[in-house]
Amino acid sequence: MKIIIILALIAIIGTLIAFKSAKKVHTPRTEFSDSEYETHSQLKLDGIEKVLGKSHDFVGHAIIPFNVGGAVDMYYFPNGIKGTGFATLELINPDGVGPIKNSIGTYELVAFTRNPISSEKDSDFFKIERRMCGIFTSLGFYTKTARIEPRETCEVPQNEGEPNICLIFDEYAPNGTHFTIGDKKHGLLLVIEIFPEEMCYAMNNGGQKLLNLLKEKGHYPYSDMNRKPVVSK
């Protein structure tokens, strides 16, 4: 089992060197018009609502936009499965380019909590929402340079003295309903926070076996940690 160690929010400065070549190389676009972004964003929201249910009117906009180094915007989906779904809508560009493709293609990130949506800062919802925003942001930057697959595990480093966050991934396509943007098929990569001993179990036995245990115990696809581990140390 491959473990991915994410170094969050690292600025990488590169020098671009042009070489002559007889073969034409496709260069992804880096700039899009407001109209392109607006149309693409609406198609993306329409597509993700078909999987997660109608989104909440409120959006958690970052003070510093993700595309210039800030946090991701958080979108909330309280009308699907019990609780609230979280999703990113900024990883895939209007030209379809986004995270490095994995077995489900290019994708956005999703996660779930059993807590109902709440704006109270001392609520359990607010705490897990802020935690998941940090996880999504770290992963969002990392996926630009590395491939992440369903059933893999991951550790996200935290501040000095704090334990790493352990995660496992899965494709999220309930009842075979896939995420599309217009007529283009993409993917939703489910992020689930797990206990360290659960990650060790996945490393030794395979991620699918851990996912099966989480489903058997009724914890899938949620990231709430007010539960007991499904495996012993």
Predicted features by range, described:
Residues 3-7, 12, 16-88, 96-104, ...:
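Acidic, proline/glycine-rich low-complexity IDRs
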